[in-house]
Regions:
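A local structural motif
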Residues: 1-3
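Glycine-rich beta-strand-centered segment in the early N-terminal region that forms part
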Residues: 5-22, 35-78, 100
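Conserved hydrophobic "DFG−1" position in protein kinase catalytic cores
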Residues: 6, 30, 95-96
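Cytochrome P450 core scaffold surrounding the K-helix E-X-X-R motif
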Residues: 25-32
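A generic structural signal for secondary-structure junctions
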Residues: 33-34, 128
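NAD(P)H dinucleotide-binding glycine-rich loop of Rossmann-like/cofactor-binding domains
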Residues: 40, 74-139
Length: 139
């Protein structure tokens, strides 16, 4: 292990300061069977897909989130088109595509929010700007 550089948000991305992460089944499967899955990954790499924390940076074109907002996110660094260690959740700061993040109400802990992206993948995409007020008041 080594320190990871602070990632910058690009267009349509946010940077989340992680307060909780969840172990997605793909994370332990990748570690168990190695390059039989995600063989395109370039190392060094940071695994982890599901996280929750606060937005610390927003990229251009992001209008749904502001710095300081509590969010959950589904990081897709293992996606063949992304292949980015900055998008792995097992670190202090994670880059997440804005459409794969959702507001987290104050009544929901970060630990509980971090486990939502795996069983509910449509959740972040469903919390569009038209519904974000509903998403921010109910878990």
């Amino acid at each position: 292990m080594a320190p990871a550089p602070y990632p910058r948000a690009r267009e349509n991305e946010i940077v989340i300061r992680n307060r909780a992460v969840a172990i997605n089944p793909l994370d332990w499967i990748k570690q168990s069977i190695g390059d039989l899955i995600f063989s395109w990954i370039r190392y060094p790499f940071v695994l982890g897909a599901d996280c929750a924390g606060e937005v610390v940076e927003v990229g251009d074109s992001v209008t749904r989130f502001a710095v300081g907002v509590r969010v959950l996110g589904h990081a897709v660094g293992t996606d063949r088109k992304r292949n980015s260690a900055a998008e792995g959740a097992f670190q202090h700061y994670t880059v997440v595509l804005a459409h794969l993040a959702a507001p987290v109400p104050d009544s929901l802990s970060y630990e509980d929010a971090a486990v939502l992206p795996w069983p509910c993948p449509p959740l972040p995409a469903g919390c569009s700007s038209r519904t974000s007020s509903a998403c921010s008041t109910r878990p």
